[in-house]
């Protein structure tokens, strides 16, 4: 073990990697952030060829509820900041927290090799470095997942990751496949610029307005009293149907699930374009057919371009197979952090939950930093708890059975699981970073 310095390698300089570095710095643990691009930012850095960010992208959680620990976003910013503001905020945090002094920029991790006592990282230029711990913060939304569609298509097909601007849709008939938040955004862009815009939806979704009673939806939700999940679903369902109306009037399928059993859509604009006839809803695709698409209800429509807003595969390509937890694009890790069979490998950012990801990364980073500090009997106690893995991360939330939802958690349950681990370990409840 003496060959490996007491130092952590954080792979990835996006919000998760920066939150991780900040936590380690607080606990006095040496670290280095290894970032393949010339600057921090992760997915918000549009200079990266794998960034999924497009011109119209905004934060889908509010600035009030989304921030690095002790570093709120500026009060004069909009409730839902633009992508360039989030990049600016991320880099400002990195400067003020001293993360640039701990960075190895423009450095790709080609391979991470475990051995007894640590990790040897081989970089893209062939150089190597040794670390006691490896923390994967390389992001969950860059490795595009694109389904094979049956049939032949005369037009162009591309993943939403490669989309940049609504100008690309001018004069075209465009179909967006997938109704996640990015798919809904891009469908709205197409509704503004394309000759014809359509969105193919496999199922109906609940649409949550970005503002409720004049405040951001997450701010409104945080101010509500704690009630059982079933009651929250019932009350909010009634409220949404009253505010949004019958979705089938707009051609949308009625949701076949309760609220929060798959991701809701935080989008006000898509309903506007549907109501004005600028966007058309289509069912799931049956097959491609030359210059058109045939849908499962028998409808055929002509299109020039198809955008696959079909999500991302989780991966850490630098890990060896025997240490790589990702199977079929997802991983089931205790607390979405810990492999059961290694005490020197951790994951941060590979989690799906409602609400702010940046705030969640701060919580995950605190737990990882504490785990790195644990020695002797404390470490043994922690590893035994991780092996037991008796954390309930859903607390009665029944998710629709899809690949996307395999790793989806109930945010309240996740926070409760962190508190449970803190109590079990005797870690100070109010310890902040």
Predicted regions, residues:
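Flavin (primarily FAD) cofactor-binding/catalytic cores of flavoenzymes
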Residues: 2-56, 72-181, 188-205, 210-211, ...
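Flexible "cap/lid" subdomain of the alpha/beta-hydrolase fold that forms the substrate-access gate
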Residues: 58-62
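Active-site segment of extracytoplasmic enzymes that catalyze sulfate/phosphate-ester chemistry
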Residues: 65-66
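Non-catalytic, mobile gating and regulatory segments of ester bond hydrolases
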Residues: 158-161, 390, 394-396
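Short, surface-exposed amphipathic charged segments that create phosphate/polyanion-binding patches used
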Residues: 214
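Basic, ligand-binding patches in group-transfer machinery
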Residues: 221
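The conserved 3'-phosphoadenosine-5'-phosphosulfate
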Residues: 378-394
């Amino acid at each position: 073990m003496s060959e490996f310095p007491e130092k952590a390698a954080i792979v990835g300089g996006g919000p998760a990697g920066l939150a991780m570095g900040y936590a380690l710095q607080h606990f006095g643990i040496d670290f280095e952030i290894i970032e393949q691009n010339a600057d921090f930012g992760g997915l918000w850095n549009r200079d990266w060829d794998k960034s999924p960010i497009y011109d119209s992208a905004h934060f889908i959680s509010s600035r009030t509820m989304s921030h690095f620990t002790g570093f709120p976003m500026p009060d004069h910013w909009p409730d839902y900041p633009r992508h360039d503001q989030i990049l600016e905020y991320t880099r400002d945090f990195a400067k003020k927290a001293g993360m640039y002094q701990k960075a190895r920029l423009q450095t790709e991790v080609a391979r991470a090799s475990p051995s007894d006592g640590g990790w040897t990282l081989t970089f893209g230029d062939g150089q190597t470095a040794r670390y006691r711990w490896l923390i994967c913060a390389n992001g969950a939304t860059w490795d595009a997942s694109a389904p094979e569609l049956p049939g032949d298509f005369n037009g162009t097909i591309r993943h939403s990751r490669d989309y940049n601007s609504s100008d690309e849709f001018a004069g075209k008939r465009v179909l967006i496949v997938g109704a996640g938040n990015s798919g809904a955004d891009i469908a709205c862009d197409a509704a503004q610029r394309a000759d014809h815009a359509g969105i193919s939806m496999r199922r109906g979704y609940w649409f949550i307005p970005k503002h409720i009673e004049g405040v951001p939806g997450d701010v409104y939700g945080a101010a509500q009293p704690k009630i059982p999940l079933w009651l929250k679903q019932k009350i909010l369902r009634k409220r949404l149907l009253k505010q949004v109306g019958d979705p089938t009037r707009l051609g949308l399928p009625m949701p076949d699930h309760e609220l929060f059993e798959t991701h809701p859509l935080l989008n006000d604009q898509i309903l506007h374009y549907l109501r004005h006839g600028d966007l058309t809803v289509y069912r799931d695709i049956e097959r491609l057919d030359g210059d058109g698409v045939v849908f499962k209800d028998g409808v055929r429509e002509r299109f020039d371009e198809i955008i696959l807003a079909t999500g991302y595969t989780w991966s850490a390509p630098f890990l060896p197979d025997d240490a790589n937890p990702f199977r079929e694009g997802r991983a089931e890790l205790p607390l979405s952090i810990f492999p059961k069979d290694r005490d020197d490998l951790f994951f941060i950012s590979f989690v799906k939950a409602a609400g702010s990801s940046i705030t969640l990364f701060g919580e995950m980073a605190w737990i990882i930093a504490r785990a790195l500090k644990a020695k002797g009997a404390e470490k043994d106690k922690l590893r035994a708890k991780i092996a037991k893995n008796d954390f309930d991360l859903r607390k009665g939330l029944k998710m629709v059975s899809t690949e996307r939802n395999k790793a989806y958690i109930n945010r309240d349950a996740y926070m409760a699981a962190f508190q449970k681990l803190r109590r079990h370990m005797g870690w100070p409840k109010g310890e902040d970073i």
